[in-house]
Each structure stands twice: as C-alpha cells, then as structure tokens.
Amino acid sequence: MRSAWWITTWLLAVCLGVPASAAAYDKDDFLAPEGKARIVFIQNQRVDRKMTFTVFESDRRCVAEVGGREAQVLDVFPGPYIFYVQGYNDTRRIELFPMAGRTYFIRLHTVTKPMGAVPEVTLVRRESEEHMRLRVSLEGALVTQSRDNEKCYARPLKERENRTNRRLNEANGDWKNGDDAYRDKYTLIERDGLTRQDIALF
C-alpha cells in the first residue's frame, strides 16, 4: 500500500512539475486571407530566444520584427517583393513571388561557425527538407500579427540610418555578385506557397 502511495505521489509530481507543451498553433492561423498571400516569419530556436530579427522592404519601412520563439504573420497582395532581413551585424536580401491564397514560410535563426553565431535566413521551399520539418519548426511558437507591432509595422527605419543603408547596399552587393545558386537559395516562387489543403494536412 505504501509503495502504491509513493508511486501515485511521484506520478502526480511529474505531471505538475513538467509543463504541458503548449499547442504550437491553430492551423487557421496560417490560412491566407481572400485575395492575399500570407508570409510567416519563424524565429523558434531556443538558443535564439533573446535575439530579434527585423524585416524591411526596399523603401526601408519595417514590415516585421520577430523574436523570442515567435511565428509572425504578414499578409501581402500578390506580386514580386524584395525584403531585407537584419539580425546582429548581418543583412540578407530575399525575393518572393507570392500567389494569392497561398502561405509562405521563412525561418530566421542562427548557425554556429568558428567566429560564433551567425544569422541565417532559410526559405521553406516546397518538397525541401525544411518543408518536411515545418511542423517541428513551428512547435511551441507564439503566433503574432505583424500589423499589431506598432513600433515596427509600416514605420521607416530611422535609427542608425547610415548603418542600415550600408548593410542594405552590402546585401544588394551579395545578391548581385552571387551566382544563380545563391539567388535561388534566397528566392521563393509561387509554387513554394502552401495551399489550404496543404495546411489542413499539417
């Protein structure tokens, strides 16, 4: 009897002491609205939880600020877009060709190199390894709307303007001087977007 009591007590302690894994998301969070495409910026590595990535357009207006295990949603009309993703001392240029009714995922994270952690942007392309791991990448992330970030959304980047311009020019230089494989790595085309049927299969 005493043994059974200890087992029951231990099981109860385990259940109370280990927090349940929060639901990563509701699938509906990622459905594109009528006539628009949805872009989801994922920053969800524990090691990066204190880091913030800033995403802005070529007019230097902020469209997203992602940090702390977050999946931030941005809705856009169809058409080509150039975005710049800034993290630490690095800025990366990416190009998107979103299609209405589809959802595109971009993972923001760091990779470890000899000189330390380096920011990286990984575009989730259809049928890629990242596509297959998408559920894992989203697990535990808080879904937010970029338009709710009043400090960022649609505001010009005024702080450290000269430094921002320099990094933007460097990112454009990397794009221009890179080969086709480099540009392909940082480009999402229409077919890379997930349909409503794809998202239903998450």
Residue ranges and their predicted role:
Residues 1-5:
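Positively charged n-region of N-terminal signal peptides that target proteins for export
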Residues 22-80, 84-202:
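Short loop/turn and low-complexity linker motifs enriched in small/turn-promoting residues
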